[in-house]
């Protein structure tokens, strides 16, 4: 079919293909099974379109969440070919192209097209593609994601913000709470205390909000143990799957910067790790491993228990000739130092 409005020519090629949808189905507290559904589709069909057709035409028992169908509500988030995404945003053509790109040469030429769909990770399954998001919402609540005016006088009409102040909130304000970042989070997988990237992205929104009066208490909370920002493993998965480009890791990093600007190295091991790393690299161009562990874990010889915990590792390194007995600065130490000092000056 060809349309020719003016000089522009738009060609629309109608392609029908058969795709096998492999859906991971599961009842609550039972083992998962894979069920396949063949479907005649077009490349432009969204995954949600296909799921609707499967439910309406083949299997009415299939359970999944949906609502807006337009990348607004976040309800239809699920794992599609191994990555968490919105079913209403992803289409058949792009998913098959991504699969072809990552497949081995042996499997690229097969004519059977398959798309695998599974429920979100890091949350228990209720049925099929529907997960229990209670812990997701509880972790969001843990960061108090709302403006606090407890220490301020509430104006008669409203809190006014400049366009510049409001612009700081735009990126995090785009979050639709779809759970894709939470599903992919490596830290959540191994650390049940970690509140998750969605919560910390919202947390930064509160830190950056000029109307909020609770910044110091918030930063104390987000700095605590590994449940807050120091629990992040910086795997970048949250940024890579976010459909709204909220960049949760970037927001977590901003909170860390706020904490590091206010805290001393002696306040906690997490803070000490960052500050000591920078100072050692600035001094020698790279890390002096003889000092790194002692300064961080041993807190500059103030933490006897921490120092004793290093002893077994130190002895094994000595026995195997792996302990660095001396340190030699790198050849580019001066350039590295100048770069770090330039960045520190720009940030101050």
Region locations from a protein language model:
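Short, Lys/Arg-enriched N-terminal segments with co-localized hydrophobic residues
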Residues: 2-16
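Eukaryote-biased recognition of intrinsically disordered, low-complexity regulatory segments
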Residues: 17-36
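Short strand-turn-strand beta-turns centered on an Asx-Gly dipeptide
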Residues: 24, 80-83
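Short, contiguous acidic and Ser/Thr-rich linear segments
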Residues: 35-46
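Ferredoxin-type iron-sulfur electron-transfer modules in oxidoreductases and energy-metabolism complexes
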Residues: 45-60, 101, 113-348
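Short, structured protein-protein interaction patches enriched in aromatics and acidic/basic residues
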Residues: 63, 68-77
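Short, basic, low-complexity termini and linkers enriched in Ser/Thr/Gly/Pro
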Residues: 94, 100-111
């Amino acid at each position: 079919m060809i349309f020719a409005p003016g000089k522009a020519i738009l060609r629309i090629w109608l392609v029908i293909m058969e795709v096998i949808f492999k859906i991971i189905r599961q009842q609550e507290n039972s083992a998962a099974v894979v069920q396949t559904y063949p479907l005649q589709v077009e490349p432009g069909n969204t995954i949600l379109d296909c799921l609707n057709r499967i439910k309406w035409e083949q299997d009415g028992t299939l359970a999944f969440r949906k609502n807006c169908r337009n990348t607004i509500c976040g309800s239809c988030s699920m794992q599609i070919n191994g990555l968490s995404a919105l079913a209403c945003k992803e289409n058949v053509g792009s998913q098959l192209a991504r699969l072809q790109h990552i497949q081995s040469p042996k499997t690229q030429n097969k004519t059977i097209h398959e798309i695998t769909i599974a429920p979100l990770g890091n949350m228990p399954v209720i049925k099929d593609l529907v997960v229990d998001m209670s812990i997701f919402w509880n972790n969001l609540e843990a960061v108090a994601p709302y403006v606090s005016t407890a220490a301020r006088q509430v104006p008669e009409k409203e809190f006014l913000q400049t366009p510049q102040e409001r612009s700081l909130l735009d990126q995090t304000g785009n979050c639709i709470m779809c759970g894709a970042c939470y599903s992919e989070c490596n830290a959540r997988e191994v650390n049940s205390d970690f509140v998750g990237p969605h919560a910390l992205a919202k947390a930064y929104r509160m830190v950056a909000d000029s109307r909020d009066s609770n910044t110091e208490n918030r930063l104390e909370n987000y700095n605590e143990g590994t449940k807050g920002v120091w629990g992040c493993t910086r795997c970048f998965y949250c940024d890579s799957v976010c459909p709204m480009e909220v960049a949760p890791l970037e927001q977590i990093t901003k909170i860390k910067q706020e904490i590091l600007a206010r805290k001393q190295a002696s306040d906690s091991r997490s803070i000490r790790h960052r500050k000591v790393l920078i100072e050692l690299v600035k001094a020698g161009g790279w890390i002096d491993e003889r000092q790194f562990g002692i300064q961080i874990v041993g807190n500059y010889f103030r933490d006897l228990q921490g120092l004793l915990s290093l002893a077994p590792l130190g002895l094994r390194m000595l026995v195997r000739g792996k302990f660095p007995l001396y340190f030699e600065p790198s050849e580019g130490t001066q350039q590295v130092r100048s770069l770090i000092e330039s960045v520190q000056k720009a940030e101050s």
